[in-house]
A protein has these predicted regions:
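Short catalytic/metal-binding and nucleic-acid-binding patches
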Residues: 1-120
């Protein structure tokens, strides 16, 4: 349940209600207009707001590595690579398919770890 809510907040998808059953689940979601929702990450401070948003979902070590990669891209003068790296994250926001893929992957990892299993 926490994972469903967390994924919804991260992806910008509002989870209205859900039903978790024995071997599957159902979600009722509202997906905002992507163009409008992403405007919060534009303009002055937009990149920092995006990185703060990502840090709610990704580990500290992942975020440190991402910040380092962005710094390296810019240090060598490759602003296009830095923007492409950030756009890869933006593409997954307000996308139900991306949310469901990530949700199922993370649930599988949690379940397998909890029950001492491997695979997907």
């Amino acid at each position: 349940v926490k994972l469903i809510r967390k994924m919804g907040r991260f992806c910008g998808v509002e989870v209205l209600t859900f039903c978790v059953m024995g071997n599957h689940f159902h979600l009722l979601v509202r997906v905002p207009d992507r163009e409008i929702w992403l405007t919060q990450f534009e303009g002055v401070g937009g990149e920092e707001r995006l990185l703060a948003h990502l840090s709610r979902f990704y580990s500290v070590s992942f975020m440190q590595a991402l910040r380092w990669q962005l710094g390296e891209d810019r240090r060598i003068g490759d602003e296009l690579a830095a923007r492409a790296r950030l756009n890869g994250f933006k593409r997954r926001l307000c996308d139900v398919s991306a949310m469901m893929k990530e949700l199922k992957e993370r649930f599988s990892k949690w379940y397998n770890k909890r029950h001492g299993r491997r695979g997907t």
